[in-house]
Structures are given as C-alpha cells and as structure tokens.
Amino acid sequence: MYKLKEGIRLRQLQDFGYKYVGNYNRGDQWLKEIDIIVDGKNLCGILIQEWGEISFRFPFIKNIKYPNIEPYIQDLIKADLVVKE
C-alpha cells in the first residue's frame, strides 16, 4: 500500500492532474480520473484521501483482482511524495 509522505500539502496534487472532489464524511478527497479497466469494470481513477491513503476510486468491487497501483502513480513516486507501507 502507498501513502503520501507526512507533511505533503494536498494542493500539490493539482500539479499531477488530481482534482479536489470534495469533503465527504471521511475527509477531503483528490481524484485523478483515468480509465483503468479490470474484468470489464472501470475503476475510474486514483483517489487520495485526506490522511494520505492512495487507492483506486472504487476499491471494493467484488469478484475482481485489482492490479498493482504502482504503475499508475509513477509521477508521485518520481516526485518523492509517497512511501510504501
């Protein structure tokens, strides 16, 4: 699992194509919309939560095997904004 490093300002994500998608009950969310088709279902992009967790936008679709997220966040890895847990 990947997370943003401590102290990273979420607004920096705009530089990498992420858009603020609102504050839901669980905090601010930033989304980079890209088509990620797995078993005929579109995961709709990469979502970063206020506490730094990085996941696919729809991480709980049943009966599919999720791909490794690493290839989809290479820009953040190269910019040294994330850590692997």
What are these regions (language model features)?
Residues Y20-I73:
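Acidic, low-complexity, intrinsically disordered interaction modules
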Residues M1:
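Short active-site oxyanion
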Residues L4-G22:
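Amphipathic alpha-helical segments
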